[in-house]
Design a protein with these regions (language model features):
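Class I SAM-dependent methyltransferase SAM/SAH-binding core
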Residues: 114-181
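A short acidic, Gly/Pro-enriched loop at the edge of an enzyme's catalytic core
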Residues: 180-200
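A short glycine-rich, Lys/Arg-flanked "PGG" loop and its adjoining helix->strand segment in the class I
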Residues: 216-231
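A short SAM/SAH-binding and catalytic strip from SAM-dependent methyltransferases
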Residues: 197-213
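Core SAM-dependent methyltransferase catalytic element
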Residues: 302-329
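C-terminal alpha-helical "lid/dimerization" subdomain adjacent to the S-adenosyl-L-methionine
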Residues: 238-308
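Conserved alpha-helix/loop element of class I SAM-dependent methyltransferases that forms part
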Residues: 91-112, 128
Length: 329
């Protein structure tokens, strides 16, 4: 972990939810107390999470939420491509080294030899996996060609990383592409990995997929690419995460769904919601193995304080975390 300590139970979710329910109305907005209304970055996630102060715009321009087309898959692909083109240096992102502690299977070379990261962005998730698991091949797809270029360049420039040819990026949108499984299998076969895909890494990506059939198709196609017995490692924004409370009402386009000023989508999930989505996609929740921390539920809210030490402010971040397995039968 490189000396980085990561906590996921900095505060109690139920207590946090009661406080929010008593003070916040999504139809009115208002967000947290003014002292907390600062730029909110999650640990290792880009600042595009912000609602307004992270993405400057002309105030005379109509809100992106006023345009229904902004929530289509094609519009989202375009918005994210523009975003990654603007931030193609990669300095806007931090490596998500905490994923190695949250998903320890990814580090085990005897268990995981092939990983598909869906929505690879700048490569901030792929890099720690490649460094921790010397036998893992990481395929990484994104609907943004700029993101794929950024991730590929980050791997090529990574210091101390051996066998950089273990990474391969490609452009694909699982919500619309019928051939994701074929694409993955062909790339693995060319590398002599004929046993199939061991793991799908799905980190801060489902929140960018339009809800409804787009999400269902996205999950079905990712599961189709996975071998029986393989796992999906999932982490995304959760109910009452700080940025959700900061969005103004005119950027709300659905239940717990918002459009940022740059046109990118932001969704915030409940535990029940993700359980239903992954079950409908044909997956089962992973059970704790011998030696695992049995005090942590397999599917849970991770409650993290992000601290701005300069201003002495703690920001309450809520993420949904879970691991699902594809049945053998």
């Amino acid at each position: 972990m490189g000396g980085v300590t990561y906590f996921e139970r900095d505060f109690d979710f139920d207590e946090h939810a009661r406080e929010v329910d008593a003070t916040w109305d999504p139809r009115v907005g208002g967000g947290p107390a003014p002292s907390q209304s600062v730029r909110a970055l999650d640990d290792g996630e880009p600042g595009n999470l912000g609602t307004g102060d992270d993405h400057r715009r002309d105030p005379r321009r109509p809100s992106a939420a006023d345009d229904d087309v902004s929530t289509t898959s094609a519009a989202q692909a375009s918005a994210w491509d523009t975003f990654h083109g603007t931030h193609d240096s990669g300095v806007f992102f931090k490596e998500r080294r905490y994923l190695l502690a949250e998903f320890p299977k990814l580090c085990d070379p005897d268990v995981v030899k092939s990983v598909l990261e869906v929505g690879c962005g700048s490569g901030s998730s792929a890099l720690p996996v490649l460094a921790a698991n010397p036998r893992a091949t990481v395929l990484a797809c994104d609907w943004s060609a700029n993101a794929v270029r950024c991730a590929t360049r980050a791997v090529e420039r990574a210091k101390g990383l051996e066998s950089k040819d273990r990474f391969e990026g490609f452009v694909s949108d699982p919500s619309t592409s019928d051939d994701l499984a074929g694409e993955v299998n062909r790339r693995l076969t060319r590398r002599g990995l004929n046993h199939g895909l061991d793991a799908v890494l799905m980190v801060f990506v489902l929140s960018a997929v339009p809800p409804g059939e787009g999400t269902a198709s996205f999950l079905r196609r990712c599961v189709a690419a996975l071998r029986p017995g393989g796992v999906v490692c999932f982490r995304d924004y959760g109910l009452y995460d700080l940025p959700m409370l900061r969005f103004p009402p005119n950027q709300r386009v659905g239940e717990r769904t918002y459009v940022r000023q740059d046109g990118t989508l932001a969704r915030f999930f409940t535990l029940d919601e993700v359980r239903v989505m992954f079950k409908d996609a044909g997956l089962v929740e992973e059970v704790a193995a011998a030696g695992d921390d049995t005090t942590r539920e397999p599917v849970r809210y991770c409650c993290v304080h992000n601290e701005n030490k300069k201003k002495g402010i703690k920001m309450k971040r809520v993420f949904v975390h879970g691991v699902w397995r594809k049945p053998l039968g």
